[in-house]
A protein has these predicted regions:
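Single conserved hydrophobic/aromatic residue that forms the stacking wall/gate
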Residues: 1-10
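Flexible glycine/proline-enriched surface loops and loop-helix/loop-strand junctions
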Residues: 23-31
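A short glycine/serine-rich beta->alpha loop
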Residues: 31-33, 120
């Protein structure tokens, strides 16, 4: 995984998308992937994103609200790797998975949700976390594509 990531960083640098030392960039990314969090932590991260970057418990603004559209767009299009499109079609939720089996998903202005449960599928996403989040989101009406019947 680190070797593939380093190769990706070198490729992005060659195209002018990354400045600086590829080894340092990969080290920083690897350390970010190694941060220990639990489901409650991930849920608070997701809730903060759903609340336009403001922590719903502390009221502290942690992410610039102007950055939220870009963050959610990247989550929607790449957050579940090769299955991002399938996930978005099924749930309508921007999401991000991690190699430890965690997934966060966001219904902007409504809720953020998280689940952790290995094992991973072929795309690198938790099988059970996907199912749990999809089921809970459906029960809460989180998919904006299913918000109202079409043609009525």
């Amino acid at each position: 995984s680190v070797s593939r990531g380093l190769g990706d960083v070198y490729k992005r640098q060659a195209y002018g998308h990354i400045e600086g030392d590829p080894l340092q960039a990969t080290d920083i990314y690897t350390r970010q992937c190694s941060v220990g969090v639990n489901t409650k932590d991930l849920g608070m991260m997701a809730a903060t994103l759903a609340n336009a970057g403001t922590n719903p418990v502390t009221g502290k603004s942690l992410v610039n609200p102007e950055d939220m559209p870009e963050i959610l767009a990247v989550m929607a299009t790449a957050g579940l790797y090769d299955d991002a499109g399938k996930w978005l079609y099924k749930t309508g939720l921007p999401a991000k998975s991690g190699v430890g089996g965690g997934i966060i998903a966001v219904s902007p202005g409504k809720f953020g949700i998280a689940a952790i449960s290995p094992p991973l599928d072929a795309a690198g996403n938790s099988v059970r976390a996907q199912k749990a989040i999809a089921d809970i989101s459906a029960a809460l009406g989180g998919n904006p594509y299913e918000a109202a019947p079409y043609g009525k």
